[in-house]
C-alpha cells in the first residue's frame, strides 16, 4: 500500500507532508515451514516559521494572535522605513503575522523504516507444537534545519501621565539582531529478537495451551547539532558560510552539541492455559525482565512478574437451561507488572558539578567541585500489583451484551526524590533518589452493547463507562512539619495546589475585618482567601495547599452508534469525561514565591495582560460597583504578582465535556457491480471529526481535552474527509 498526506496548519506557513509505503509478504515454504516479512517506510516533512507555535514556548504565535490589540495599525513608518506594528502596547516584537512570515523557517525531515521477519516451524511429529523466530529492525533518522531571521516592530508607547501624545519606537526581536543557522541530525535504531515455542492440545475435555518466549531489545541513538551566527546571504545559508559575528560586529561563538545512548533489555515469558470442557479456565504466567538501568550487583536488574487468572463459563454447565442467555462468564485475575518509571541510568552514580568563583582563598576567587547528586545503587523497578473481578454477559443473540469489571491496583517502589527526607545530622549526604512513593488505583468499568437486524437494516450501539480514583498512599516529598493540607499523602493523584477562595471582597469594611496579604494591595472586587491556619493573615507558606480538585477525570465514557441498510451506513462516536478540574491560571512566569508552576495569571484571567488584548467576557462579567455579582474580579492592570494572580479555587472550572468525536457516512455499491468493474468491493465515505463539543469551558474558548492554558495551545481541528476504499 502507498499513502500520501498533505496538511496546512491553522497558522500561516505551517505545513505537514507524509509519504508512506507498506509491503507484507507471507510464504509457505512447505507443509511445516512458513515465512513472513513486513516492511514499512514513512517520510514526514514539517515546515514552519522560525518562530515557534509550540504551546510550551513563551509568546508562541497562537498566543500572540489571541492577545493582539484590535486598534493598532498593521504597519507604521519610522524614519522612512515601514515596520509591522507590535500588537501590544509597550511590548516589543509581538506581532503574530511577522512571527509567521519574517522570522525565518524551520524544516524537519523524519525518515522511518520498520522491518519485521518471522520464521515458523510446525513440528510434524508433535501435533500442536511450533517454534517461531522473529526479528525486527526499526530505524529513524531526523534532519532538522532552522534559519532564524530577526525582525523589528513599531511599538506603540502609551503617553506619559499628564500628556496625550502617542508615539511609536522601533524595537528589535527578542531573539536578537543576528541571523543564525541551526542544523541537527538524529539517528536511532532498535533491534528486537524473539524466540518462542507454542503448544496447543486437546485431550478429551481437557485443553492446554503453553508458551515459552525469550526476547531481547537493543536501542542505540546519536544526535549532533550546531548553531552558527551571522549570515550575510540567506541564499548561502550553510554552516561553512557563517561569520560568527553579531549585528553590531562583535564575535559570537558558535555552539555545538551532541549526545548518544545505548540501552539493552531482555525478558523471558512463560504462560500456561488450561480449560476443562471450556467451563473452567485457568491461566498461569510469569515474566522475568531485566534492564541495563539497574545495577546487577544490587540484585535489582531482574524482576519476576507472576500472574494468574480464573474463569467460569457458567452457561456451559449441564444444569444451566436459560437458552436465551448466550454467554455468562465469571472471571478473576491477579498479577504483577513493572516499569522503569523514567529512571535514568545515571541515578545510581554520584554526580559532581564544577562551580566557578565559589569561594575566596588567599584573596583569589577559586572554583570548587561539589556533589550535586548522591547515587543510589539499590534503585529498583516500579511495581504494580493488579486485581480484577469481572463478568461477561450476552443474551438474545447479541441484543444485549454486558462486560463489567471491578479493579484495584497497588503501585509501589515508585521513583522519588528524597531530598529533605533525612535529618540535617546527615550533613546532606543521602541518596538523591529512591523508590519510596506509593499510590493505589481503584474503580470499575462496564461496556453495554446492542446489535439487531430488522429486515435489511442492521443497527447497534456500544456504551463504555469507566470510573477510576487514584490516591497517594505515601509521597516522599512531603515535609513532616507541613500541615496536612500541604501534603500529598492521602490525596488524589493530580490534586491542584492553591488557595481556597471565599468569593470577592464587597466593601472596605469587609477587607478590614478579614485576613489579607500584607504585601498586596486589596480593594473591593478582589479575591478573598480563606485563612487556613488561622493566624490572621494570608501567606503562601501557610495558606496555600492541595484542594479537593484533580486535573485527571474520574469518569470517562463513550457511545458508538452505527447502522447500515442496503449499502448505506452511518457510524458516530461520542466521547466525554467528568470529574476533572481545569484551572484558568497558568505557570509560565516567575511567581511571587520565586518558583515556577504554582501560580500566575494568564490572559484568560487578567485584563490586558502584558499589554495585550482581553477576552470580552473578562470585562463584561467582571466585578464593578454596579455589578457586584460579576464572575471575575475587579479589572486591574497591576503586576502579575497582584492579589488576584495566585492559583486558587476561584479560577477552577469544571472540565466535563461531551464531544461528537467522529461521524461517518458511507455507501458500498452492490457486489455484482463491483465485480463487473473488476473489484471485490467499492465504498465511498464522508467523515468528520471534532464536530460538536458541549462543555462549560466553551465560553472561555478552552478545549476540554487541552493539557493546560499556560501559553495557549494548538487547537483541536474540525477535520472533514472524503474517501474511497477499493478492494481487489
Model-derived regions: residue spans:
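A short beta-strand motif that forms part of the nucleic acid-binding face
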Residues: 2-4, 41, 288, 408, ...
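Periplasmic-side early beta-strands and strand-to-turn transitions of outer-membrane beta-barrels
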Residues: 3-16, 50
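Extracellular/periplasmic, surface-exposed regions of secreted and cell-surface proteins
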Residues: 18, 24-43, 47, 51-52, ...
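Extracytoplasmic gating/loop element in the C-terminal half of outer-membrane beta-barrel translocons
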Residues: 92-99, 291, 521, 577-678, ...
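Conserved small-residue
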Residues: 225, 437, 451-551, 582, ...
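Conserved SET/PR-domain catalytic core that frames the SAM/AdoMet-binding pocket
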Residues: 472, 543, 553-567, 661-666
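Glycine-rich, aromatic-lined ligand/substrate-binding cores of catalytic
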Residues: 550-585
